[in-house]
Amino acid sequence: MQLDEQRLRFRDAMASLSAAVNIITTEGDAGQCGITATAVCSVTDTPPSLMVCINANSAMNPVFQGNGKLCVNVLNHEQELMARHFAGMTGMAMEERFSLSCWQKGPLAQPVLKGSLASLEGEIRDVQAIGTHLVYLVEIKNIILSAEGHGLIYFKRRFHPVMLEMEAAI
């Protein structure tokens, strides 16, 4: 199997891996930016840490690294449009995205998306280059949780709501 064919088959396989949709944000001396990401996972709870993967070609990497902090906003099922904005699917400029009234500052001064299922602010502890992506290891310092809302996942290259299972009628 040729490398390009294997790469495409791998991408197709990963499209079958349901993943939570997140908007990763940062703000500081290096600027303000955000990106939609599904390559996010927990690493450990002691200390609370996450792994965030961003394409190495993204112009946002110097901003994330320069600020040294970020916020992972776990989207709810009603925030698909925001996911599309931050994925660059709508043509909305970065400045416009952050001018919407749905943002507030967290204790680490990072952009926190109101209504997210969870917003996790943290400090970037390490960045590793692996293939086409940079892997950010982030130590979480602040967590905001919401009891409201259902999940939003990306599956088969499309957004899908994940509703809480209803109790079966007896």
UniProtKB/Swiss-Prot annotation:
E.C. number: 1.5.1.36
InterPro entries xref list: Flavin_Rdtase-like_dom, HPA_mOase_red, NADH-dep_flavin_reductase, Split_barrel_FMN-bd
Pathway: Aromatic compound metabolism; 4-hydroxyphenylacetate degradation; pyruvate and succinate semialdehyde from 4-hydroxyphenylacetate: step 1/7
Single GO MF annotation: oxidoreductase activity, acting on NAD(P)H
Gene Ontology biological process terms, A to Z: benzene-containing compound metabolic process; pyrimidine nucleobase catabolic process
Superkingdom of origin: Bacteria
Assigned keywords, A-Z: Aromatic hydrocarbons catabolism, Flavoprotein, FMN, NAD, Oxidoreductase
Tagged with keyword Iron-sulfur: no
Catalyzed reaction equations: a reduced flavin + NAD(+) = an oxidized flavin + NADH + 2 H(+)
Induction note: By 4-hydroxyphenylacetic acid.
Record PANTHER family: FLAVIN REDUCTASE (PTHR30466), FMN REDUCTASE (NADH) RUTF (PTHR30466:SF1)
Family according to the record: Belongs to the non-flavoprotein flavin reductase family. HpaC subfamily.
Quaternary structure, from the entry: Homodimer. 4-HPA 3-monooxygenase consists of a reductase component HpaC and an oxygenase component HpaB.
Chain's role: Catalyzes the reduction of free flavins (FMN, FAD and riboflavin) by NADH. Subsequently, the reduced flavins diffuse to the large HpaB component or to other electron acceptors such as cytochrome c and Fe(3+) ion.
Protein name as catalogued: 4-hydroxyphenylacetate 3-monooxygenase reductase component
Taxonomic source organism: Escherichia coli
Lineage of source species: Bacteria, Pseudomonadati, Pseudomonadota, Gammaproteobacteria, Enterobacterales
